[in-house]
Amino acid sequence: ADEVNKEVNSWVEEQTNGLITDLLPPNSASPLTDLIFANALFFNGRWDSQFNPSLTKESDFHLLDGTKVRVPFMTGAHEDSLDVYEGFKVLNLPYREGREDSRGFSMQIYLPDEKDGLPSMLESLASTRGFLKDNKVLPSQKAGVKELKIPRFKFAFDFEALKALKVLGLKVPLSTIIHKSCIEVDEVGSKAAAAAALRSCGGCYFPPKKYDFVADHPFLFIVKEYISGLVLFLGHVMDPSKH
């Protein structure tokens, strides 16, 4: 069983360029295990317009409980797309990857106007059908970016997904589904990976108006292929000081 664990984890580590090293926890395979399915997704995206590392400075990030942490913030004069909605703004950071084969990848950062506004923003988005795939379902105003500050962040998340699938009404002939995701965002771009094991027993025009986009409080991020609307990674940053 230990050899099975090592073999699966070694394969996942190789496929995700070392971002995920321990998908299967110890003793997850046993003599009663008949079958293990494993898949992995790795995304390494370079910003179309990279941040200058020499401009990265430490600043305060405000947590939901009212406390603050000091973290490195990337900054720069990017001519990026900004959509202004009631109560929040969405910054679109395109990647270079995919331009040559008629695809387009980007990271969208959803920043609530209020420092403690993430829960209410998530509730509003969850109640708006199809918004994450097509942002045009809500009225917005196009704008430019005046001051841009985004924290560097890196974190991993894992959970047992079988219960969630059962809640959705899916009948899965498996005893366990382990899902783990990892993402790292810095001045060059972002590296993201996701893995799962299943065990059975261009240029834009901006209006003159510009807004600051200072992500110094909890926000939502999405990595997507924006031509099809396919969401590759989704998460929220609560405390960028924690890895």
Q: Regions from the language model: what does each represent?
A:
Residues 127, 198-202, 237-242:
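Active/binding-pocket-proximal capping segment
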Residues 1-121, 131-210:
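Non-catalytic, conformational "gating/processing" segments within enzyme and secreted inhibitor domains
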Residues 92-94, 208-243:
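Feature captures eukaryotic membrane-trafficking machinery centered on endolysosomal pathways
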